């Protein structure tokens, strides 16, 4: 599902910045080395993005986080390997009854303790259309740094915003040049035209009655948190059992949430998982398999060589000592090692194909991004102008319009013919039904007089007239 997720700020970024004690120079310092941009252009120039895992993966790379990817989740029950967090895209309708039920449910789990809020990265969305970046950062900046390499930009942002209020963290995100440029570089041209029509600083989502909004679900200190930039506080859904994974708790929360949200048959939502780059795990597994392949192959060669020497009687017939190998030669026969080597070759081929598939996916992400962000307006206008200049545009338009007219004319003729046929058939049927009772009475009278009912009285009269003429 590719829905544009815009989201709305709780207030204009400029107004929020005026009330904030955080200086604009400090905000721009989070992106050292970046080109200076007007503050209004940074805060009010964010564009809507589509909900696409390929787009989000490339956006993470542009942020400087290279070892992460985003995958779309189609089945909640299917296990997901080592997710950092989940991003939930849902249809936002302020006045919807199901929305009020969700608000009433989540209000009970708000975390209002300032110390607890400052210990996690929770940013309020004060900049319109930035909820996609907010959702990604809510996952990445709450992960353990030992498991994830954030890159220079996100690392500086995390350090700089430590201890800030959620509002100031939202301003820091909206006024970081690298984040704004990376975000807008993946927007469609229609989003830019829509922003120019509505005007900067005016939300195109929340206050128009309907939108699509992103929220994040991440595990923090043994608790499942829901981070929504349009909410005043983060939400704590509680912990999970010792025998469970945090994704089991997430599945239960999502099942309940979707059950409430789909009460009015509205199932427009999308779920994505932020996971480690699959290519890293595949590459590591390939390296291990190739190492084992070399060990098994070397051990097999030594074993075959020792057997040949034993059979010829030349040299020592004892098995070779291979302390550098992981396999003990005496525990395996040559046939066992050959079978093991064959299995390793198969596993290597399978993982090489998986790695090639992942690389092809990344290539297609870039191709789709080029198609998505390219502005085709100039090409289309130039192409149509050239056709008009050559005098063939009108002919092409007529050729494409005539078939539809012919089809509509044929359809009308078929309808008239069908109506005429139906009317004729109806008249014949009425006449036959009117004559049927008289014919039945004549046949009944003939049967009563002992005469054959096969001939009608009219035919007998004709026969008598012919006889009289002959006489």
From Swiss-Prot:
Its EC number(s): 3.4.19.12
UniProt entry tagged with the keyword Hydrolase: yes
Catalytic activity: Thiol-dependent hydrolysis of ester, thioester, amide, peptide and isopeptide bonds formed by the C-terminal Gly of ubiquitin (a 76-residue protein attached to proteins as an intracellular targeting signal)
First-tier enzyme category under EC: hydrolase
Subcellular location field: Nucleus
Region of interest called Positively charged C-terminal tail required for binding nucleosomes, as start-end residue ranges on this chain: 405-471
Annotated site location: Transition state stabilizer: 125
Region (Disordered): 412-471
Bias type Low complexity, positions: 420-448
Gene Ontology terms describing biological process: epigenetic regulation of gene expression; heterochromatin formation; protein deubiquitination; specification of segmental identity, abdomen; ubiquitin-dependent protein catabolic process
UniProt cross-references to SUPFAM superfamilies, sorted A to Z: Cysteine proteinases
Residue span, UCH catalytic domain: 45-276
Domain of life: Eukaryota
GO molecular function: chromatin binding; cysteine-type deubiquitinase activity
PROSITE patterns, per database record: UCH_DOMAIN, ULD
Annotated catalytic residues: 131 (nucleophile), 213 (proton donor)
GO cellular component: chromatin; cytoplasm; PR-DUB complex
Biased composition (Basic residues): 457-471
Important for enzyme activity (site feature) positions: 228
Similarity comment: family membership: Belongs to the peptidase C12 family. BAP1 subfamily.
Subunit record text: Catalytic component of the polycomb repressive deubiquitinase (PR-DUB) complex, at least composed of caly/calypso, Asx and sba (MBD5/6 homolog). The PR-DUB complex associates with nucleosomes to mediate deubiquitination of histone H2AK118ub1 substrates; the association requires the positively charged C-terminal tail of caly, probably due to direct binding of DNA. Interacts (via ULD domain) with Asx (via DEUBAD domain); the interaction produces a stable heterodimer with a composite binding site for ubiquitin.
PANTHER family, A to Z: UBIQUITIN CARBOXYL-TERMINAL HYDROLASE, UBIQUITIN CARBOXYL-TERMINAL HYDROLASE BAP1
Function field: Catalytic component of the polycomb repressive deubiquitinase (PR-DUB) complex, a complex that specifically mediates deubiquitination of histone H2A monoubiquitinated at 'Lys-119' (H2AK118ub1). Mediates bisymmetric organization of the PR-DUB complex and is involved in association with nucleosomes to mediate deubiquitination. Does not deubiquitinate monoubiquitinated histone H2B. Required to maintain the transcriptionally repressive state of homeotic genes throughout development. The PR-DUB complex has weak or no activity toward 'Lys-48'- and 'Lys-63'-linked polyubiquitin chains.
Name of the protein in question: Ubiquitin carboxyl-terminal hydrolase calypso
Organism of derivation: Drosophila erecta
Gene that this sequence comes from: caly
């Amino acid at each position: 599902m590719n829905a544009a997720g815009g989201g709305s700020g709780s207030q204009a970024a400029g107004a929020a910045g005026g009330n904030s004690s955080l200086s604009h120079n400090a905000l721009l310092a989070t992106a050292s080395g970046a080109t200076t941009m007007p503050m209004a252009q940074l805060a009010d120039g964010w564009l809507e993005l589509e909900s696409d895992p390929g787009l989000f993966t490339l956006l993470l790379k542009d942020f400087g986080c290279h070892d992460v990817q985003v995958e779309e989740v189609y089945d909640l029950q299917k296990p997901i390997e080592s997710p950092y967090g989940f991003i939930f895209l849902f249809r936002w309708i302020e006045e919807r009854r199901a929305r009020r039920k969700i608000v009433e449910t989540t209000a009970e789990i708000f975390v209002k303790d300032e110390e607890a809020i400052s210990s996690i990265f929770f940013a309020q969305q004060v900049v319109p259309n930035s909820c996609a970046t907010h959702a990604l950062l809510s996952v990445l900046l709450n992960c353990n740094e030992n498991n994830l390499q954030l890159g220079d930009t996100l690392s500086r942002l995390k350090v700089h915003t430590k201890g800030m209020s959620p509002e100031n963290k939202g301003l820091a995100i909206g006024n970081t040049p690298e984040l704004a440029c990376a975000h807008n570089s993946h927007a469609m041209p229609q989003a830019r035209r829509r922003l120019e029509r509505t005007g900067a600083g005016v939300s195109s989502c929340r206050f128009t009655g309907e939108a699509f909004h992103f929220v994040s679900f991440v595990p923090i200190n043994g608790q499942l948190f829901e981070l929504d930039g349009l909410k005043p506080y983060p939400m704590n859904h509680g912990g999970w059992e010792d025998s469970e994974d945090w994704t089991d708790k997430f599945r239960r929360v999502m099942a309940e949430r979707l059950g409430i949200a789909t009460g009015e048959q509205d199932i427009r939502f999308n779920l994505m998982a932020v996971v480690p780059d699959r290519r890293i795990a595949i590459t590591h597994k390939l390296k291990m398999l190739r190492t084992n392949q070399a060990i098994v192959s070397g051990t097999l060669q030594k074993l075959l060589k020792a057997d040949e020497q034993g059979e010829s009687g030349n040299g020592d017939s004892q098995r070779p000592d291979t302390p550098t190998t992981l396999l003990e030669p005496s525990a395996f026969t040559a046939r066992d090692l050959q079978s093991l080597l064959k299995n390793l070759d198969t596993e290597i081929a399978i993982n090489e194909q998986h790695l090639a598939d992942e690389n092809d996916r990344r290539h297609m992400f870039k191709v789709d991004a080029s198609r998505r962000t390219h502005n085709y307006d100039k090409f289309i206008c130039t192409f149509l102008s050239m056709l008009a200049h050559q005098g063939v545009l009108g002919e092409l338009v007529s050729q494409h319009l005539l078939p539809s007219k012919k089809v509509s004319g044929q359809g009308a003729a078929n309808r008239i013919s069908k109506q005429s046929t139906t009317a004729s058939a109806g008249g014949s049927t009425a006449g036959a039904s009117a004559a049927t009772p008289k014919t039945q009475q004549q046949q009944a009278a003939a049967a009563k007089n002992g005469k054959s009912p096969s001939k009608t009285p009219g035919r007998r009269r004709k026969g008598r007239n012919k006889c009289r003429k002959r006489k």
